[in-house]
């Protein structure tokens, strides 16, 4: 599960400092404090523009993965919400809008629904097992007319309208999914950028646990930095902060850390 550790990198140049040993220790402590307090307070730099969303489910939300976690070839671009170990849970539209895309694949999302909202965002619901009747009817008609199962359907604007809280699909385990869950994304309408959904759903999630760091890495820039007389990287346990390291030049630091939430044994990436 090392791919769920997040390495928080901080760049600094200590070549001109008076006390190089103290500089590294104090810098690492600042990074650790930012990690802990950022996790406890829920610090986010993203501007939500005052948008509001309701919960996609009528039961308490628990996550199996969060936004930005490391994957073998990409960053995880949404929230994976647990569905109590089963498929078929009703999924509610998180805001008023219209169905802008219906996606059916063998892998990836499996079946996914895109709903465009007037507040500047589009919500994506992935790995669903089926859609609401009017959406399912539209999809089946398209599939029969084009004689294809796999498809990427784009209804006209406002052709299929939905209301906040309306059931739009049933949760599933379709596509590249390792177990029943809803993959929920938010994207900006103006440029398609992925947005972290977490700040919008904090009231539906219980999270009083701070991230836990386990390793610290020191990375000299080749030709520009040295740690303890060596150009090689040094990775040590978090308790090694009690030690002193001799360093010169330009150094990167990294922290391996995991985040946790209440009510579940899952661990998450930190960002």
Where are these regions (language model features)?
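Intrinsically disordered, low-complexity Ser/Thr- and acidic-rich flexible linkers and loops
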Residues: 136-154
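Histidine-centered catalytic micro-motifs
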Residues: 179-186
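Bacterial Sec-dependent N-terminal signal peptides
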Residues: 1, 8-9, 13, 18-51
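Surface-exposed, glycine-biased beta-strand/turn segments
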Residues: 45-122, 129-131, 148-151, 155-158, ...
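Intrinsically disordered, low-complexity regions enriched in small/polar residues
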Residues: 3, 9, 13-14, 24, ...
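Short, conserved acidic/polar surface loops in the N-terminal third of protein domains
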Residues: 125-127, 135-138
